């Protein structure tokens, strides 16, 4: 029985890995003047979890940064200053682009660029499956099925989001095309009116000069 469960578990793990978002650490090189940002377009009601760590090549100088995470409409979700590492977590309230910016603190980096390692997770990848397994008292294949169910649900929600975005973009495109058509008609009408006025003016001018 155990021999049959092992291949099944491996297969489920492979399916979850292929369906789930790939979570890799992002490396940013922050200039000693200015800031560097990372962003991701996320739909609403999605869990976001991220850890960040400043990496310095010189052990004598350990730079600090100011961190600000904002929602699509500018709401500040996380803000820290003079820090070398930290974590932020939130559940998105609206769909759009979420932005995390890192700015070097003055006189803490020796006027040299440095790097930041960011482990950014969203959706099913941000869930604490160990806690879920302990809470629901599940393990093995049952836990893998739970992960697979979450992955399928996340993909389904993402497809719905993409379909809604496509519908919104189509409406915007149709409105834009309609406005361009009206603008073209108005431009053509103005050109015709201006041409008629010019002809009328020239006719009156030549009649006044008795040229015609």
UniProtKB/Swiss-Prot annotation:
Pfam families: EMP24_GP25L (PF01105). Keywords: Coiled coil, Endoplasmic reticulum, ER-Golgi transport, Glycoprotein, Golgi apparatus, Membrane, Methylation, Protein transport, Signal, Transmembrane, Transmembrane helix, Transport. The chain crosses the membrane at residues 180-200. A motif (COPII vesicle coat-binding) lies at residues 205-206. Residues 201-212 are cytoplasmic. Probably oligomerizes with other members of the EMP24/GP25L family. Associates with the COPI vesicle coat (coatomer). Associates with the COPII vesicle coat (coatomer). This is Transmembrane emp24 domain-containing protein p24delta4. It comes from Arabidopsis thaliana (Mouse-ear cress).
């Amino acid at each position: 029985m155990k021999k049959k469960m092992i291949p099944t578990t491996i297969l489920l793990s492979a399916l979850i890995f292929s369906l789930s978002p790939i979570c890799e650490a992002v490396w940013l090189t922050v200039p000693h003047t200015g800031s560097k940002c990372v962003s991701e377009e996320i739909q609403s009601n999605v869990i976001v979890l991220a850890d960040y760590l400043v990496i310095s090549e010189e052990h004598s100088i350990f730079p600090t940064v100011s961190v600000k995470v904002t929602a699509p409409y500018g709401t500040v979700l996380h803000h820290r200053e003079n820090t070398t590492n930290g974590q932020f977590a939130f559940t998105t309230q609206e769909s759009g682009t979420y932005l995390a910016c890192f700015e070097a603190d003055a006189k803490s980096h020796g006027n040299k660029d440095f790097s930041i390692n960011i482990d950014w997770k969203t959706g099913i990848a941000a869930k604490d499956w160990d806690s879920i397994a302990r809470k629901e008292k599940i393990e093995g294949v049952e836990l893998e099925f739970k992960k697979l169910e979450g992955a399928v649900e996340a993909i389904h929600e993402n497809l719905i989001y993409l379909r809604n975005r496509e519908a919104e973009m189509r409406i915007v495109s149709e409105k834009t095309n309609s406005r361009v058509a009206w603008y073209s008609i108005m431009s053509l009408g103005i050109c015709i009116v201006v041409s008629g006025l010019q002809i009328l003016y020239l006719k009156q001018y030549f009649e006044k000069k008795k040229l015609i």
